Each structure stands twice: as C-alpha cells, then as structure tokens.
Regions:
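Positively charged, small/polar-rich N-terminal and surface patches that mediate targeting and assembly
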Residues: 1-136
Length: 136
C-alpha cells in the first residue's frame, strides 16, 4: 500500500476567483455531532446539511468499537456536516469546529473548505450573498 501524499504548501486561490462564499464540509464521529452542531449554532450558523456517511482515515485497520462492539475499521460510520457561509469568516468556522471536535486521537475528523461559485435560492430567485441571508 502506498503512503499518503504529504501536502507541502497550500495553493492560494487567486483573488479574482474568490467569490467570498465558501462551503465547509466537516467529517465527524457520530458521538461528536451534537457538540459540533451546538458550537456552530452558537457562532451564528443557522443552516447545515447533515449526511450519515461511511469512511476511513488513519484509523483504518485498527480496532474500533461502535456501540460497544468491535467492528471492522475499514469503513466507520461518520457524519458529514456541510455549511455554506458568506457572512461568518471561514476561519471562525474552522476554529469552532476544531475546538468542538478535538480529542488528540486518531479519528477527530477532517475539515474541507471549497470556494462556491454560485448560490441560487429557488423560492425567491435570490443569488449569491443574498441567497445565503436568513431574512424573510
């Protein structure tokens, strides 16, 4: 099995391509989801998409317990939380999620940040920044 490729340098997004809207995907253990949801709500995140997923990372192949039983650690149940933000700084989302999830052990989770090119609120036709605002 080949070793993971180590990232040596972050490639900055050219300013012309940065829409100021970002999707943050957070992969988290089931047991940590409620703490993450509460922490995100406390900083003003009002909407999120939550999906139950299966995945593995560095803990692959190690013994894991799920609901008290030893399970095959090839794929473990996780939760993927996705938020799209424009008003709340991405770094605040990352910092909040990291503090809510950190245990110092393998399996604490991963955070992925993507630039969002376009958002359309279907009901109103609002686009981009306006589509992300919670006003009626």
């Amino acid at each position: 099995m080949a070793a993971a490729v180590k990232v040596v340098q972050e490639a900055p997004l050219p300013a012309a391509l940065d829409s100021k809207m970002h999707k943050v995907s957070i992969i988290v253990q089931l047991a940590k989801f409620e703490a993450l949801k509460k922490a995100l709500n406390n900083i003003g995140v009002t909407g999120m998409t939550v999906t139950q997923v299966m995945g593995c990372g560095l803990q692959k192949g190690s013994g894991e317990k799920y609901r008290g039983a030893e399970v095959d650690a090839t794929l473990l149940p996780k939760v993927k939380v996705e938020v799209v933000v424009s008003k709340i700084p991405v770094e605040k989302i990352i910092d909040t999620a990291t503090k809510a999830l950190y245990t110092g052990h393998i399996g604490d989770g991963k955070i992925f940040v993507y630039n969002v090119a376009k958002v359309v609120k279907v009901r109103t036709g609002e686009q981009d920044y306006n589509a992300l605002q919670d006003v009626e």
